[in-house]
Curated annotation (Swiss-Prot):
This is Histidinol-phosphate aminotransferase. The keyword Amino-acid biosynthesis applies. It catalyses: L-histidinol phosphate + 2-oxoglutarate = 3-(imidazol-4-yl)-2-oxopropyl phosphate + L-glutamate. One of its GO terms (biological process) is L-histidine biosynthetic process. It comes from Methanobrevibacter smithii (strain ATCC 35061 / DSM 861 / OCM 144 / PS). GO terms for molecular function: histidinol-phosphate transaminase activity; pyridoxal phosphate binding. InterPro entries: Aminotransferase_I/II_large, HisP_aminotrans, HistidinolP_aminotransfase, PyrdxlP-dep_Trfase, PyrdxlP-dep_Trfase_major, PyrdxlP-dep_Trfase_small.
Length: 366
């Protein structure tokens, strides 16, 4: 059997390395490995979510809820929007992007992504026959090149992806830039990825009440600590949400994911503490790594940061390999379009792990 032509031409998406892989490859104890490659929450999930999951396990022989009104309302309350402006995805934010593509993308459409940015947009939309058009992220000034995006728009443009804070640079996009792009292009869907917005303490959610062509992606994998439960959500005008619900899989959110999400959202103290600890770790890492002359550390408003390592004498692959041998996983950014072979990305960890990581970096560079 031959797959569709587009599938034959695609490369597989390669996520960051797991602790199991590194433990096996380098004969290390899995529990001693510091994982900084996947932008996860290192502080664990909400205790209330864990308790709720335990209670719900007895019901997993039954299909999950098909109507998610209670969770939709909790997400609406958390986000400060109407319930009709919320859609929930059961495979993290990736399902939200996938349903967006199924709803709005026709074969031959184009979508714009500034580089570097999250690579999964391209991976998903190409499956539906859309063609990526690359705009620029100004790395020297570490900001979005808005003119590059505006100049790339044509009558085939269907979507523009704006990640804020941007992955992997950690930089916020000015609300004015989003407004300028959206207001001049009412027939183009502006997809604003806010997966990490809590760490920046900035959101563009009010724009969905002003613009019918703005869609905001969010996730519960980061601050909420539910990466393993796979739950994302989106915010937009009610019309867009209604269209998406027509084709969204009915039972994509598992029973365990549902109760985990619901109880995490109700655990306000957990959310506040998770944000505070994440920001504390980020600032500690930035301050300590910035003291190392050979590293070019980008300031970040997320739970990760981009680091240029050209002056170390290592390529990203070489540096990542040396760190892995000592039990540290970072993201080698060589595969990120828009970056060369001298960039890595690290995510936050506990303060104990932060200090251990700094010592290992100094050891590798000495």
């Amino acid at each position: 059997m031959k797959p569709r032509a587009i599938v034959s031409e695609m490369d597989s998406y390669v996520p960051g390395k797991s602790q199991d892989e590194i433990a096996s490859e380098f004969n290390l104890n899995k529990d001693d490995i510091i994982k900084l490659g996947s932008n996860e929450n290192p502080f664990g999930p909400s205790a209330k979510a864990i308790e709720a999951i335990g209670k719900e396990c007895k019901n997993i022989n039954r299909y999950p809820e098909s109507v998610l009104n209670e969770l939709q309302q909790e997400l609406a309350n958390y986000s400060g929007v109407k319930q009709s402006q919320v859609i929930i995805g059961g495979d993290g934010a990736d399902e939200i992007i996938d349903v967006l593509a199924k709803t709005f993308i026709d074969e031959g459409d184009e979508f714009i992504v500034p580089l570097p940015s999250y690579m999964y947009y391209e991976y998903l939309l190409q499956q539906y026959g859309a063609r990526p058009v690359y705009a620029k992220w100004n790395l020297e000034e570490n900001k979005l090149d808005t003119d590059s995006i505006l100049n790339s728009i044509n009558n085939k443009t269907k979507m523009i992806f704006l990640c804020t804070p941007n992955n992997p640079t950690g930089t916020l996009i000015d609300e004015k830039d989003i407004r300028d792009i959206a207001s001049g292009n009412p027939d183009v869907l502006i997809v604003v990825d806010e997966a990490y917005f809590e760490y920046a303490e900035v959101t563009n959610k009010d724009l969905i009440n002003e613009f019918d062509n703005i869609f905001i992606i969010r996730t519960m994998s980061k601050v909420m600590g539910l990466a393993g439960m796979r739950m994302g959500y989106g915010l937009a005008c009610s019309e867009i949400i209604e269209y998406m619900h027509r084709i969204k899989p009915v039972f994509s959110l598992t029973r365990l994911s549902y109760v985990a999400a619901l109880n995490t959202l109700r655990d306000k103290n957990y959310i506040e503490t998770s944000i505070e600890k994440g920001i504390e770790s980020r600032e500690y890492l930035y301050n300590e790594l910035s003291k190392i002359d050979s590293l070019n550390v980008f300031p970040s408003k997320s739970n990760f940061m981009l680091i240029g390592i050209k002056d170390t004498g290592f390529t990203a692959s070489e540096f990542a390999f040396e760190l892995m041998k000592k039990g540290v996983i970072v993201r080698d950014c060589t595969s990120f379009k828009g970056l060369d072979e001298y960039w890595i990305r690290i995510s936050i960890c506990t303060l104990e792990e932060d200090k251990k990581f700094i010592d290992i970096v100094k050891e590798v560079l000495s």
